Amino acid sequence: PMTLGYWNIRGLTHPIRLILEYTNSGYEEKRYNMGDAPDYDRSQWLNEKFKLGLDFPNLPYLIDGTHKLTQSNAILRYIARKHNLCGVTEEETIRMDILENQVMDIRMQLIMLCYSPDFEQKKAEFLEGIPDKMKLFSQFLGKLPWFAGNKLTYVDFLAYDVLDQYRMLEPKCLEAFPNLKDFISRFEGLEKISSYMKSSRFLPKPLFSKFAFWNNK
């Protein structure tokens, strides 16, 4: 089986865990634990970091036989290619490329907020900007069932994850966008996803590491 290595948090790895489950991939997880404040000891990971044969040692990593990958989107795309969860047409590919990067942008904006010591002060302004972000996602999805088109692709796993994170921060943020709410329901209704969400393997939170200022436990 494949081995997925990451901190014992949701973090950047939720879409990867979801796609591994959806595709029925045989995998095991190596979840590294971080120590508590003030040191946040990382030795569980650091002791192995340079022993795994990774080109750019980092978390998450995926080891699949001779293939050893880092970078969360590279891992996600690798699994997607094995299972035809990539677009076929140029139009689908363009939409996937745009959305993959757009998701990373709004993910990083949320990460910057949540790891900021000024989280409480910055939160109000951040919340004000959420409707505009969601509106663009809603317009991009339009009447399509999935973000690239009529079939599920790896970017739906990314979009689901980031929309869900924003929903955790601001529970009403999707209320004005019925197509995004329907997308979430459609995704969570996929048989493999639904059963994974009910299993003990499912790790919906903490979103972030112990030194974040929100959703850190």
Curated annotation (Swiss-Prot):
Its EC number is 2.5.1.18. It is found in: Cytoplasm. Glutathione binds at residues 6-7, 45-49, 58-59, 71-72. The keyword rRNA processing does not apply. CDD domains: GST_C_Mu (cd03209), GST_N_Mu (cd03075). It is an enzyme of class 2 (transferase). Pfam families: GST_C, GST_N. InterPro entries: Glutathione-S-Trfase_C-like, Glutathione-S-Trfase_C_sf, Glutathione_S-Trfase_N, GST_C, GST_mu, GST_superfamily, Thioredoxin-like_sf. Residues 1-87 form the GST N-terminal domain. Substrate binds at residue 115. GO terms for cellular component: cytoplasm. It catalyses: RX + glutathione = an S-substituted glutathione + a halide anion + H(+); prostaglandin A2 + glutathione = prostaglandin A2-S-(R)-glutathione; prostaglandin J2 + glutathione = prostaglandin J2-S-(R)-glutathione; prostaglandin J2 + glutathione = prostaglandin J2-S-(S)-glutathione. The keyword Lipid metabolism applies. Residues 89-207 form the GST C-terminal domain. GO terms for molecular function: glutathione transferase activity. Keywords: Cytoplasm, Lipid metabolism, Transferase. One of its GO terms (biological process) is glutathione derivative biosynthetic process. Homodimer. Conjugation of reduced glutathione to a wide number of exogenous and endogenous hydrophobic electrophiles. Involved in the formation of glutathione conjugates of both prostaglandin A2 (PGA2) and prostaglandin J2 (PGJ2). Participates in the formation of novel hepoxilin regioisomers. Belongs to the GST superfamily. Mu family. This is Glutathione S-transferase B.
